[in-house]
Design a protein with these regions (language model features):
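Conserved short beta-strand edge segments in small beta-sheet-based binding/regulatory domains
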Residues: 57, 71-75
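Short Lys/Arg-enriched alpha/beta "domain-start" segment
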Residues: 1-39, 69-71
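Intrinsically disordered, low-complexity regulatory segments enriched in Ser/Thr/Pro
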Residues: 40-66
Length: 75
């Protein structure tokens, strides 16, 4: 996935997933750790390249990734 906006814009999109998360700055990338109580999903974003990568439990990740892609396409 790709996102070329600002961190605040990305946070707004991620908030639309309605899954609580905490954001952390990790040097060259930003990380959103989702707190859904059932998975270990994390969203990594490299602002310089725009690369977005969702990692964690595939059972939950696939659905969240699909929803996130839809939100990004419709913004």
């Amino acid at each position: 996935m790709q996102f070329n906006g600002t961190l605040d814009e990305l946070k707004t999109v991620v908030n639309e997933l309605q899954i609580p998360c905490n954001w952390e700055h990790k040097g060259s990338y930003e990380l959103a750790a989702f707190e859904d109580g059932i998975s270990n999903l994390k969203l990594n974003w490299w602002p310089e390249t725009g690369v977005l990568r969702l990692v964690g439990d595939p059972e939950v990740r696939n659905d969240v990734e699909r929803r996130l892609k839809e939100l990004l396409e419709n913004r």
